[in-house]
Swiss-Prot record:
Signal peptide residues on this chain, from the entry's feature table: none
Protein name in the entry: UDP-N-acetylmuramoyl-L-alanyl-D-glutamate--2,6-diaminopimelate ligase
Extent of motif Meso-diaminopimelate recognition motif: 414-417
Localization per Swiss-Prot or TrEMBL: Cytoplasm
Gene Ontology cellular-component terms listed: cytoplasm
Gene name, Swiss-Prot/TrEMBL: murE
Record note on modification: Carboxylation is probably crucial for Mg(2+) binding and, consequently, for the gamma-phosphate positioning of ATP.
Length: 495
C-alpha cells in the first residue's frame, strides 16, 4: 500500500533512508513479490540473508537484513537498485518494525494475552465470547486458529512469527474486531514474537511439564513464561493463585488480580481478587458461586470439570478488571459455549458419553480425567498416546496418570511422526505399575472405535491428545483423522 513507506518505517532507528513505497512485509523469499519489503533474519535453521538475491529477482522494493559479519547497524547499501538496510538484533526488533508497518494494531483494539501450559485456548475463547455477548466484536488468536469468532482460520503454531502476529492483528482490526484474546506461547515469548504488542491484560493459567525438548528444564520454562510480565507491555496481570508458580509471581506483582478455586487468596494480602465459594458439578456442566473485589455472583456453566471452572474464573476476572459490569457478565455467563476439542462432549441416547480433549501433557491428562470422573457414574475409559519426536520424558508420566485415574486405559498412537509407534507405546507402558492392565491398540481410529463400541451407557470415554486436530502425522505424512468426527460418526451410527 502507498501509505507504507520505507523512510517512515525506519525513522526511529535509521536516518537518510530512501523513500520507497512498500506493499507487504515478508520473511519468506519464496512468497516475496513486486513492491514487498523482504526482511532477512538469521533464524535457528536458516540465514535469510542467503535469499536476498532471490528476493531481488522477484522484484522486492527494499530489504532489511541482520547486521552481522561486515555490515554495521544502520548501514545502507544498494544491490541491483534495491536498498538494503542493516539492523543489529533484528529478531528482537521485528515485532516493533512490524507494528509500525501495520500501523500499531494493538492500539486499535483491546488485546488480552493468555500464557500458561494448559487452558490457554479455552480461556481465550471464553473471554472473546463473553466480550462479544457484552457488545464487543470478539476475535481469537492461537492453537485452534486466528479470526473473528465463528470465522477462525487454522494456524500452524500457537504464536506465529512477529510479522504474522502484527499482520493478523491488523487484519482483525480491519474486519471490525474491538476485542482480541491471544494465546501467548513460551516459544513466542523467548523468540520476541509479541515484544511490541500492547496488552490491556495478561493472564497466567498454570505451569506444568511441556516443551522441555525446547526449554531444557522447568526453570527455563518458567523463566520463558515470566518474560510476559517482566519485559513486555503486559497491562493488568491476572494470575491463577492455585498454581505454585502463580503464587510466586503474585508476590512479585502487587497490582495483579489473584484468582482461586482452592482458597489460596487472603484478601488482606492481595490487591484485587476473585475466588469460587462453591461449585456444584452436574450432568450438563457446573453451577459456580463466587466472591470477588467486585462483588458476588452465580454462573451456570456448560463446561465440564474443575479446570474449566478455573478457566472461566480467569476469563471473568480479566473482564472485571477491564471494567466490564459484574451484573452483565453474570447474566450472560450461561450462554458461553464449550470450546471445540476442549472437554467437548458427544452423546447419544443409550450410549456412552464421549469426551474429546486436547490433553497431551501429564498435568492436562490428569485434569481431564479428574474432570471426566466428576460426570461419570460408570467406568472411565481413557484413549491416549504421545507424540513422536517430542519430549520422551512425559511418556511414562502420562502412563502412570492414565493407570491411576482411569478405570480402563487404552494406549494407542498420537502423531508418531518418524518414531516407531510401538516404541512410543512401550515408553508409556513403562510408567505403569501393571502394564498388563492397559489395553494396547495400535492405530488410533481402531482404538477409539473399540473403546466406544465396548463402553456401556453410563461409562465415559475420554479421547485425549488430539482435541480440535483433524490429522494424524505418521512418518512424514499428514493423514486425515479426527477424534471429533470419529466420535460423532460412531455415536450417530450406534444411536
Amino acid at each position: 500500500m502507498a501509505d507504507r513507506n520505507l523512510r517512515d518505517l525506519l525513522a526511529p532507528w535509521v536516518q537518510n533512508v530512501p523513500a520507497r513505497a512498500l506493499r507487504e512485509m515478508v520473511l519468506d523469499s519464496r512468497v516475496a513479490a513486486s513492491g514487498d519489503l523482504f526482511v532477512a533474519v538469521v533464524g535457528h535453521q536458516a540465514d535469510g540473508r542467503r535469499y536476498i538475491p532471490q528476493a531481488i529477482a522477484q522484484g522486492v522494493a527494499a530489504i532489511i537484513a541482520e547486521a552481522k559479519d561486515d555490515a554495521t547497524d544502520g548501514e545502507i547499501r544498494e544491490m541491483h537498485g534495491v536498498p538494503v538496510i542493516y539492523l543489529s538484533q533484528l529478531n528482537e526488533r521485528l515485532s516493533a518494525l512490524a507494528g509500525r508497518f501495520y500501523h500499531e494494531p494493538s492500539d486499535q483494539l483491546r488485546l488480552v494475552g493468555v500464557t500458561g501450559t494448559n487452558g490457554k485456548t479455552t480461556t481465550t475463547q471464553l473471554m472473546a465470547q463473553w466480550a462479544q455477548l457484552l457488545g464487543e466484536t470478539g476475535a481469537v488468536m492461537g492453537t485452534v486458529g486466528n479470526g473473528l469468532l465463528g470465522k477462525v482460520n487454522p494456524t500452524e503454531n500457537t504464536t506465529g512469527s512477529a510479522v504474522d502476529v502484527q499482520h493478523v492483528l491488523s487484519g482483525l482490526a480491519g474486519q471490525g474486531a474491538t476485542f482480541a484474546a491471544m494465546e501467548v506461547s513460551s516459544h513466542g515469548l523467548v523468540q520476541h514474537r509479541v515484544s511490541a504488542l500492547k496488552f490491556a491484560a495478561s493472564v497466567f493459567t498454570n505451569l506444568s511439564r511441556d516443551h522441555l525438548d525446547y526449554h531444557g528444564d522447568m526453570e527455563n520454562y518458567e523463566a520463558a513464561k515470566w518474560l510476559l510480565y517482566s519485559t513486555h507491555h503486559c497491562g493488568q496481570a491476572i494470575i491463577n493463585a492455585d498454581d505454585e508458580v502463580g503464587r510466586r509471581w503474585l508476590a512479585k506483582l502487587p497490582d495483579a488480580v489473584a484468582v482461586s478455586m482452592e482458597d489460596h487468596i487472603n484478601p488482606n494480602c492481595h490487591g484485587r481478587w476473585l475466588k469460587a465459594t462453591d461449585v456444584d458439578y452436574h450432568d450438563s456442566g457446573a453451577t459456580i458461586r463466587f466472591a470477588s473485589s467486585w462483588g458476588e455472583g452465580e454462573i451456570e456453566s456448560r463446561l465440564m470439570g474443575a479446570f474449566n471452572v478455573s478457566n472461566l474464573l480467569l476469563a471473568l476476572a480479566t473482564l472485571l478488571a477491564l471494567d466490564y459490569p459484574l451484573s452483565e457478565l453474570v447474566n450472560t455467563g450461561a450462554r458461553l459455549q464449550p470450546v471445540c476439542g476442549r472437554m467437548e462432549v458427544f452423546t447419544a441416547p443409550g450410549k456412552p458419553t464421549v469426551v474429546v480433549d486436547y490433553a497431551h501433557t501429564p498435568d492436562a491428562l490428569e485434569k481431564a480425567l479428574q474432570a471426566a470422573r466428576l460426570h461419570c457414574t460408570g467406568k472411565l475409559w481413557c484413549v491416549f498416546g504421545c507424540g513422536g519426536d517430542r519430549d520422551k520424558g512425559k511418556r511414562p508420566l502420562m502412563g502412570a496418570i492414565a493407570e491411576q485415574f482411569a478405570d480402563i486405559p487404552v494406549v494407542t498412537d498420537d502423531n508418531p511422526r518418524t518414531e516407531e509407534p510401538r516404541a512410543i507405546i512401550n515408553d508409556i507402558l513403562a510408567g505403569m505399575m501393571d502394564a498388563g492392565h492397559a489395553r494396547v491398540v495400535e492405530g488410533r481410529a481402531e482404538a477409539v472405535t473399540n473403546a466406544i463400541m465396548q463402553a456401556k451407557e453410563n461409562d465415559v470415554v475420554l479421547l485425549a491428545g488430539k482435541g480440535h486436530e483433524d490429522y494424524q502425522i505418521v512418518g512424514a505424512h499428514r493423514l486425515d483423522y479426527s477424534d471429533r468426527v470419529t466420535a460423532a460418526r460412531l455415536l450417530g451410527a450406534l444411536a
